[in-house]
Amino acid sequence: MRVLGIETSCDETAAAIVERDDMGEGRILSNVVLSQIAEHEPYGGVVPEIAARAHVEALDRLVDRALNDAGLKLYEVDAVAATAGPGLIGGLIVGLMTAKALAMAAQKPFYAVNHLEGHALTARLTDGLPFPYLLLLVSGGHTQMVLVRGIGDYERLGTTIDDALGEAFDKTAKLLGLPYPGGPTVERMALQGDQKRFALPRPLKGEARLDFSFSGLKTAVRQTATELVPLTDQDVTDICASFQAAVADTLSDRVGRSLERFKTEFPDCATPSLVVAGGVAANKTLRAALENLCTRHGFAFIAPPLNLCTDNAAMIAWAGAERAATQAPDSLDIAPRSRWPLDEKSAPVFGTGRRGAKA
């Protein structure tokens, strides 16, 4: 089965075609991503209206390029999939409406994909990973520990009770006057700094629950920087290094407890695995810390290639292909959802508003 996937949930416009065979093995035929960093850089963050307009301008040509790169015509794909949430509602509408129109024009089945499910299933595309496994999803909008039992069968073990980790990286960069996007910049500066100079907190470290918290760490960074004004270049690199070390320690503690829980629930699992996905998973220091943690606990550490950690359409096409193997297509009247928890059975951490559960 060949599936055309479309991703427009935030500030990347993407289209891809993925093939899934009868044995469940996947192959990426094309994967095109257009970043909007240049459009949002002057504002220090993503502006939803600008993002939606950029998706409108770029998506048609990206779909054409994805088809051309795969050597296919639209009628030769077997299904169309698009991100329906969670994300910025304007961007979701652009991608969802485009995908519906293509599916209707080509008379192909349509699948509305949860963006988080795309991340959750990427390791099955790249590594053929069997169920069950643990997923650490770390991005600008989400920080979650998820038990993946099967397609559509997810249990949220822990989530952030305040800021997502990617947001904490971006806010730290902004506090220090570093350019957007903040995550890669903080990582690069940290390589030159002294991680022991500042004793920053490790939020929730040692607690039995599996949730995350990063707002206190972000506040500590702001207080440290304020006390040092005017900041020298060495101050900035040392703060970045101390911040990143605190994050690595916090993740190792939180994830380590999740690994122990997994072993208790699945004592007979032959190859227990931790999958790390999301944009923050591209951070090499954090990946190394988590890989060492997995080695100590007897887990396989699986991180998709860096270009599949950040937002892309290959993961959306693959999630659509996985669902198509066992589930009926979605109706074309399905609506986008700015909030769409991966595990809708769990109680929302932040409560429920008019638009649904927040996390």
UniProtKB/Swiss-Prot annotation:
UniProt superkingdom:
Bacteria
Q: Which reaction does it catalyse?
A: L-threonylcarbamoyladenylate + adenosine(37) in tRNA = N(6)-L-threonylcarbamoyladenosine(37) in tRNA + AMP + H(+)
Q: Where are the transmembrane segments?
A: none
Q: How is the cofactor bound?
A: Binds 1 Fe(2+) ion per subunit.
Which EC class is this protein assigned? transferase
Please give the cofactor(s) recorded in the UniProt entry for this protein.
Answer: Fe(2+)
Write out the ranges of the annotated region (Disordered).
328-359
**GO molecular function terms noted in the UniProt entry:** iron ion binding; N(6)-L-threonylcarbamoyladenine synthase activity
Where on this chain does Fe cation bind?
115, 119, 311
SUPFAM superfamilies per the record? Actin-like ATPase domain
Q: InterPro entries from the entry?
A: ATPase_NBD (IPR043129), Gcp-like_dom (IPR000905), KAE1/TsaD (IPR017861), TsaD (IPR022450)
- A Pfam short name: TsaD
Query: Which biological process, per GO, is one annotated for this protein?
Result: tRNA threonylcarbamoyladenosine modification
Per UniProt, the keywords (alphabetical) are: Acyltransferase, Cytoplasm, Iron, Metal-binding, Transferase, tRNA processing
- Report the principal subcellular site: cytoplasm
Might you give the EC number(s) for this enzyme?
2.3.1.234
Provide the protein's localization: Cytoplasm
What GO cellular component entries does it have?
cytoplasm
Where, by residue number, does substrate bind? 137-141, 170, 183, 283
- What does the protein in this record do? Required for the formation of a threonylcarbamoyl group on adenosine at position 37 (t(6)A37) in tRNAs that read codons beginning with adenine. Is involved in the transfer of the threonylcarbamoyl moiety of threonylcarbamoyl-AMP (TC-AMP) to the N6 group of A37, together with TsaE and TsaB. TsaD likely plays a direct catalytic role in this reaction.
For this protein, the record's HAMAP family field holds: TsaD
Which family, according to the similarity comment? Answer: Belongs to the KAE1 / TsaD family.
Query: Can you name this protein?
Result: tRNA N6-adenosine threonylcarbamoyltransferase
- Which gene produces this protein? tsaD
